[in-house]
Amino acid sequence: MGKRSAAGLLTSVDSIFTTQEERDNAKRSYVTDLSAAEISDFPNHPFKVRMDQSMVELADSVKQYGVLVPSLVRPMPDGSYQMVSGHRRKRAAELAGLPTVPCIIRELTDDEAIIVMVDSNLQREQILPSEKAFAYKMKLEAMKRQGMRTDLTSAPVGPKLRSNKELSEQSPDSVTQIKRYIRLTNLIPELLDMVDNSVLKEAGKLQMALRPAVELSYLSEAE
């Protein structure tokens, strides 16, 4: 079999076992090492990078073994890169004194980046109520924008209902619970910190802290 025939066969086999979307993503993604100075944080990133015991342990691991899982970044028009997933790994690498961080570079739209950022961080073992609140809000808004762009003939309520249901299906929380979390984004920072701190002290107090906080979210700041 000639080289051209073999290449054609491989292309055909690849087409059978992968989708067009997967092939397109593969073409626009690659891995390289980047310095921390080249990577900006995701704007309004809802997940806190805390200097806690978990971070100390992660930094020690990175110092000993390196960064085992690459971060995900997207290229920006000015030639820099924006972190999508891997803020804690980047910070751990800095604490460990590493000059660069392995990164997957992928072309993503603003809404695609938001959805990937939220989905990747929801896998954490410990997530604060405030983090979930703003993460769910950001992802829901991104999903609604995508729905409006892809289904312009639908009534306005259509994409909204579908987005709420889809978000719940992609998350560990119900539609009702997600709505409760999003209500927390209306709280003043001091009250939101109180909710977070109560959960940090005792994880089992989530529902106990969430109920009054949601009720307070309906009050105006003056009230």
Predicted regions and their residues:
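Short, charged/polar connector segments at secondary-structure boundaries
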Residues: 1-106, 112-125
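Structural motif corresponding to the C-terminal cap of alpha-helices
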Residues: 66, 71, 143-147, 189
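Short coil/loop linkers at secondary-structure junctions
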Residues: 68, 99, 174, 199-201
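Amphipathic, charge-rich alpha-helical segments that serve as recognition/docking helices
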Residues: 91-186, 206, 211-218
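Short Lys/Arg-enriched helix C-cap and helix-to-coil transition segments
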Residues: 189-211
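Short, intrinsically disordered, charge-balanced linker/junction segments flanking boundaries
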Residues: 221-223
